[in-house]
Amino acid sequence: MRVEIITPDKELFKGEAKSVVVPGVDGSMGFLNNHAPLITVLKAGDVKLRTESGEEVFPVKGGVVEVMNNTVLVLAE
C-alpha cells in the first residue's frame, strides 16, 4: 500500500509499505492492504512501517491518519 507521513515542516516518508501501525487515541491500530476507509486522531507515539527493506519507525506527537483506497496518509505533529 502507498504511505505518506507528513509534518508541517517536511515529508518524513513517501513510498510503499506492507503494513502500518499508528498510535491511535484508543490504542495502537494496524493497517494492511484493502483496509476499510477510516479517519482517526493520533496521540504521541511511534508510526511503524513494515517495508521491503525492514521496519521503519517515525516518532510523532499526535496528528490525524486517513486510510482510503490502499493509501495511508499520516498528517503528524
For every predicted segment, state its role:
Residues 2-77:
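Compact, glycine-rich, soluble single-domain proteins
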